[in-house]
């Protein structure tokens, strides 16, 4: 800077000398007037160093200034002290006085270059002046400050550089300060230019309420432009600019943007060829189950359907063929999703089209047995605990409760009508898959013994066999020998089942399932029995082949079921005829299961049984106590005449099986026992404990009341009447009440003149003894018969019904008065 200043001064003096006509001289020899020396003294001039010394001294470090030039060879090493003239000029320059040479800057530009100090840097080609600062017409764009939340882990961006005008003036060695910037408002939060010395990790708990990291950064709002400076003119909107969104790094908000990748769509799972083959096989198997071809013969599957045709998927998964392929229920449901003939809903499946054609008759009947034994009466009936139903003749809404309780069977209609299910004697099932296991589960031990050990089958000819397809069927004592009782409470008289377990109440839905299971199982036994007869129509003998039943058609069963107990028939049996055994009844789809009724809505004289009971006709041949024996009976492998059977004296449990009824029977403690043995055990218990003290006898009364309504057996009816009257004589009326219910409902189903006369006689007799229950059932029988052919009434009974007992309320009022009198007497 010193050398440059020195060269400028020399050039100026040379210019002045030329303009004044003076020759070129060294400016160091020119003297100034004393006046200037006196007027413009320079402070500290005496302490100035020599020019040569000053040029050799290093300059202070100043990045904007260039390095000092080396001294010229023409300049002597020792430079004299500048004269006062030089001092005055320097003063004039430094004091701010105008230099005459600076008034015409154009002359300087015309110069080709300085003529002295050739080794110095050339002067700029133009005269440098300080550029004045003009503020922009709009406020400067100030970047948004860094607004960071608490515990924000990222450092703020550095401040944006702001351009400033030049800060130095040409020809002046003194540095000029930068022009001040427009005032900037302080940041709302913190100082954006000051980094945080200590920053903690990001803690989501310190996040401001209502704010949080966003998945995608929102681009800045691109609204209409602010308009032109002078306006585009009235009536025209400003232009709208649409710009692409900035890159993610340029978006600055209270939090850095977080970008989540788009989820990758994996698509449907790709099954292996083995899985695809398994899916097709499962689908084909289940579709076959629900095909019309299979349903025509598959009564078991039909029994599993509910009122809408649905079958639980778990049950289908438990079938042998399906279970052998897979036990994954979810995979089965997945496979059925590709079916066109089977539909899936939740955990149930059914036939897609025409499923209503295969609903079991017991679940789609239009006149279900929904009314209790006392449904002819008011639900307020207090005469019997079984009178809990509400009378509703001709109920049109069938429910599964039709087979759920003590009084669940209405005598208005018979739900089991022939033809409701497609079944016949010639129908055959796939015994390899279901029938064998299904039948073997229910066979008694003696049946299994005969099935597995005997190479030849018995050729005994039944005098009258049970043909379930016939609309009219004759049942006699011979058939009773094949009757099997299914009891829930056996061997105990305290209400607990076998082994001390309490009898469980059977829900309505499960009771219907058990009922259907017992019936269809009975059909399976019949088919197996028919198949055995065909295969063994001829037996090999030494003399040749003879018919197995030849000469053996002697009627068996002369020892009636009543004789097993050694009891004598006496009351109202003298006028019974043996043709009563040919009483015709339709039992093609008769009820097989009677669930317990634990509700007691009246002042019954005793507690009704709390356990359920059922039955089916087994295939066990009768005990060999007849005069003639078959070859099978005389075989060493079979029971000898007069000996006790090897098993069957005690109830047998049901092995577990996939059929729902089997599992329910096992879980609820049901046992199977031949009727004749069960009857004998009940009578022995009654004799031991006394009338009214045997719970098993109560079950037997209840069974008789239901069974005889559909299948009349004379010997069974005689037992029923005899023991009920004996208990009533001992002030125990449960058996008698069961008998009256049998009369009322049974006669409405199948009217019989002899039974009707017994009904009238017993009703009148017990009315005179103060018991209104028989008269009430007699009134209900006539009241609910409707407009059928009138029946002649007993004169005294007809008078009572016309004068005193015209409605059920009259019975309730009479019963209340009787109870009040009894309470006062006590």
From Swiss-Prot:
InterPro entries: DM15, La_dom_prot, La_HTH, WH-like_DNA-bd_sf, WH_DNA-bd_sf
Domain of life according to the entry: Eukaryota
Sequence ranges of Basic residues compositional bias: 527-536, 574-592
Residue ranges constituting the HTH La-type RNA-binding domain according to the UniProt record: 272-361
Pfam families for this protein: La, LARP1_HEAT
KO phenotype (gene knockout): Reduced heat-induced fold reduction of mRNAs and impaired attachment of XNR4 to polysomes.
Skewed-composition ranges (Low complexity): 600-619, 640-649
Modified residues (N-acetylmethionine): 1
Alphabetized Gene3D superfamilies for the sequence: Winged helix-like DNA-binding domain superfamily/Winged helix DNA-binding domain
Compositionally skewed regions (Pro residues) per UniProt: 60-83
Biased composition (Polar residues): 380-423
CC annotations in GO: cytosol; P-body
Region annotation Disordered: where it falls in the sequence: 1-128, 366-428, 527-649
Gene Ontology molecular function terms on file: RNA cap binding
Residues bearing the modification Phosphoserine: 378, 381, 465
Matches recorded under CDD domains: LAM (cd07323)
Family annotation (SMART domains): DM15, LA
Compositionally biased spans, kind Basic and acidic residues: 537-548
GO biological process: heat acclimation; mRNA catabolic process; mRNA stabilization
Purpose of the protein: Required for acclimation and survival during thermal stress. Heat-specific cofactor of XRN4 required for its targeting to polysomes and subsequent rapid degradation of seedling transcriptome during the early steps of the heat stress response.
The protein's assembly and partners: Interacts with XRN4 and facilitates its attachment to polysomes upon heat stress.
PANTHER family: LA-RELATED PROTEIN 1A, LUPUS LA PROTEIN-RELATED
Family: Belongs to the LARP family.
Protein name (Swiss-Prot/TrEMBL): La-related protein 1A
Native source species: Arabidopsis thaliana
